[in-house]
Design a protein with these regions (language model features):
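Domain-core detector
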Residues: 1-147, 153-158
Length: 158
């Protein structure tokens, strides 16, 4: 709704039902990423444990502790970024706004690929040069998405 207000469109012109497919796909992809990362970390922890290593990720218990203390925060941030970016773009599309989208890098320590995107503006239906439609777009894969704090700014054409 904030995205609608930003471009001067009444809230009731947005159809929230169209978000259902996006949210289902996003949750499916994110669950796959979480499960794959957890599997890899568990396999590695068993190797480390067998070798007598110590540390947070050196036991299966430590893998889950790390997931709760660290990975969950990073995942939550990335999911919020993805939903925010997608919803702004979808709202503009649904109301037929003549708008562009600008990548806004907000992190104090962004990954280099996201720092390079700062201020890049493209058409609402175009991909950014990194192949993503918005920050948090799973097209970037987990290495580009996890922990992403970037945002989208809608730019209306006058």
């Amino acid at each position: 709704r904030n995205a609608l207000r930003a471009i001067g469109v009444p809230d009731d012109e947005y159809d929230p039902e169209r978000a259902s497919a996006f949210l289902a796909d996003m949750c499916r992809v994110r669950a796959e990423w979480v499960n794959e990362t957890t599997r890899k970390e568990l396999e590695r922890s068993l190797e480390l444990e067998a070798a007598g290593a110590e540390g947070l990720k050196a036991t299966p218990e430590g893998v889950f502790e790390n997931a709760i203390e660290n990975r969950s925060v990073s995942a939550g941030t990335a999911i919020a970024s993805a939903v925010d970016g997608w919803s702004a773009i979808e709202a503009a599309r649904q109301v037929g706004a003549d708008a562009q989208k600008r990548w806004v890098t907000t992190s104090r320590n962004p990954r280099p690929s996201h720092a390079a995107m700062a201020g890049v503006t493209v058409g609402i239906d175009e991909k950014f040069p990194n192949g993503m439609d918005w920050p948090g777009d799973w097209a970037g894969g987990p290495d580009e998405v996890c922990g992403c704090q970037c945002e989208i700014e809608l730019v209306t054409r006058i």
